[in-house]
Regions:
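Short, solvent-exposed loop/turn elements at beta->coil junctions and helix N-caps
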Residues: 1-2, 131, 227
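Conserved phosphate/anionic-ligand binding catalytic regions in large, soluble enzymes, centered on
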Residues: 21, 61, 125-134, 285, ...
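Active-site proximal loops enriched in glycine and acidic residues that flank catalytic Cys/His/Asp
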Residues: 98-100, 126-130, 270
Length: 291
């Protein structure tokens, strides 16, 4: 609820694998924006995750997860304790993630994740942290981050010469574009074969595809949903006359003639529901922001 807590926020990957899961995911998103927003960013707490976890696969996510931050700031024992909390919360719907990044801390974290997989038999998926789509976008991504942090290219060069490269910018050289399976296979062969056993690598790929298929099988109703009115024309007429009486307009005949003419036109175009929906939105806006 304060600046300190905001800085302790962590990442969690949630994947809906059923219609119920999608609804729960929407509920979590809505709650985060309506009740958990702080400094313009939505947040979700453990209580809400427990309440809306059905039909969702959760994973250990990246180095910025609760487990990853515990591993980085405290150590493996604290990270393992966080992992067991997640397993207790999500059960069999909780998976581990390994990533093949050039990020300097990633190999040690992958080793820890594989150790937890061996110890607790939690399935692993293989993912790729993606900050941009194509390899050639790396330079543009770095420039965007410089603009956001108020740095210049010369600032970064000076920091690199001084040996003061920040992880924030180091990540931009960590192969963070969206990769094909062939690219992932090549990366394993050239950089990660001594860290990730081939059988674990293959099993993680299979599990990833399995989860992707489950998520792809969720059928979403994308039709437009609007409030239904049994008799929209009559409802609109009542609201018009109520407003007319409330305003106590002086030249009644002129206004009544105009009301009849415009009301008839609205009904003939079947726009009554539209006006009623607009009235609902205006009323709600006035309720939320009375000033």
């Amino acid at each position: 609820e304060d600046q300190k807590a905001f800085g302790l926020g962590s990442h969690l990957l949630a994947i809906a694998i059923s219609e119920e899961g999608y609804k729960n995911l929407v509920n979590l998103t809505s709650w985060g924006w309506l009740n958990g927003k702080y400094r313009g960013k939505p947040r979700i707490n453990h209580e809400q995750l427990r309440k809306h976890k059905e039909g969702i696969i959760f994973t250990s996510c990246c180095y910025s997860s609760e487990i990853g931050r515990a591993f980085d700031k405290i150590g493996p024992e604290a990270a393992e304790e966080k992992l067991l909390q997640m397993v207790d919360m999500f059960g069999d719907n909780y998976l581990l993630e390994i990533m093949m990044l050039d990020f300097v801390k990633q190999p040690a974290y992958n080793k820890f994740i594989i150790k937890m997989h061996d110890k607790y038999h939690i399935p692993i998926i293989l993912t790729q942290d993606c900050h941009f789509c194509h390899q050639e976008h790396s330079h543009n991504q770095r420039l965007m981050l410089m603009i956001q942090t108020g740095r210049t290219i010369q600032d970064i060069k000076d920091a690199q010469l001084a040996g003061d490269t920040k992880d924030f910018f180091e990540l931009q050289d960590a192969n963070l574009w969206l990769k094909s399976e062939d690219e992932l296979n090549l990366m394993w062969e050239t950089k990660y074969s001594h860290i990730i056993d081939y059988e674990i690598f293959k099993a993680a790929k299979r599990k990833t595809v399995e989860i992707a298929k489950l998520a792809s099988g969720v059928k979403l109703d994308r039709s437009i949903k609007l409030p239904m009115f049994p008799d929209a024309d009559e409802d609109l007429r009542e609201k018009i006359m109520r407003g007319f009486k409330w305003r106590r307009l002086p030249t009644r005949s002129n206004y009544l003639d105009r009301i009849k003419r415009e009301y008839k036109l609205i009904c003939s175009k079947e726009f009554s529901s539209y006006f009623l929906i607009q009235k609902m939105m205006i009323d709600e806006a006035r309720r939320v922001c009375p000033e």
